[in-house]
């Protein structure tokens, strides 16, 4: 037990494996399952939770059996992606815990389980509020704060974003203070935070909690790998692309061994990063076969638009954003649909369809008002500003300044740079000197982010305004970031197929990068490239 509390999962595993040889008790099996979970041996951990459940049933410890069943449900469903198995374990936990009756703390867990599978948001909210009250009445923080975290998610999904996020903050504060004891609850609360922050682009909140909880996450090895896919998405929005790539690749690599549902979520976010970087071929390769995944729409639509396939992007976005154009938005519309509407405005503008672009921008503005979040309001202002620029009507500068302030407050550097570029376009005839200054700022931001496609657009605008810009390779190296990565891996002795597997790109793409880097460095073959790496002490 001490090893588990100290976060030494390996020592705890050894101790409980020895104890298991002497007694097949529910407690020993459950503790071993916890140690395996902390080592991220999820399949084996789930199997031991299932064995712990059976042992507790034999020992007539129903509360403990329900706890083991809930842990098995969390792993099989939320980590391994087997939703039918998850539903079975949730149903089993609910049946067992219902035997205790409504006057016991176990009823709080029953309500949480019911809420988890309840499709109606209002009913779900009622169940969770009842569970919170039970947790407080019986002094059970695991019930109270897990229900509170889930309630926060319900509020976010029903457009009460700030209220919901504050409930998530409270749950995490209790978690960091050590009030919760159940391992699955800890991961559920962390994952809920990352999911919500990614959904509403709340970069500052996620960043603050990652710092505040750093000791807990490091010591206990909590936060499942698939939760880190959400965090990778947040880092992408924050412009911290190298960190995002590390998180997303680690999450994808962890699930390489057959857990495809969770691997795919990380791969889709990696593809979205590639689109932002302008590495469109790699993004397309990553998304091949994932076109029906529920998370794919933003990345796939953005890829279509970037490749000049506006009709494909329009068809995809129109199908998933159908809803009311009335004065009162549908419940949940701002949280789920808002970001897609912003992308749809870009598509209509690309096609020259100003009427539909204005209609969707106005719809986006209405639902942004319902959410009260800085990101969506800024996105709505940017959309209206772009419509004004394209149509030559209205006051685009006012909208774009609003967008600039909102994106800066939300700490979204890519969106700040995009807005500066639009502001430069808006001012190009009236105030060319100011337009040049804004375009130069945008270009510097895009170059810092390594957003090649957008940097090219900023450079083209500057040239059209008669402003000199730097051309050619920057610094002493002529290699792109991806070419440098390929060069480093050549130095480790990897073959082209192995490099492709490591970087999630095709063999043909690897061959292209190898040819380019050899030409740029004046090398004749891979052997000379490997020698170059060794001579210059280049490490991956």
What are these regions (language model features)?
Residues 12, 45, 85-86, 124, ...:
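Single-residue signature of alpha-solenoid repeat helices
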Residues 9, 42, 62, 82-83, ...:
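TPR-repeat structural position
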Residues 23-26, 30, 59, 63, ...:
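Residue signature of alpha-solenoid helical repeat architecture, marking inter-repeat boundaries
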Residues 17-21, 50-61, 74, 91-99, ...:
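Amphipathic alpha-helical segments of tetratricopeptide repeats
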Residues 356-422, 465-476, 498:
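Generic long, charged, amphipathic alpha-helical segments
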Residues 1, 5, 30-41, 66-82, ...:
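Tandem amphipathic alpha-helical repeat scaffolds
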Residues 411, 460-463, 469-515, 519-524, ...:
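Helix-turn-helix DNA-binding segment
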Residues 48, 438, 513-516:
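Residues within the DNA-recognition helix of helix-turn-helix
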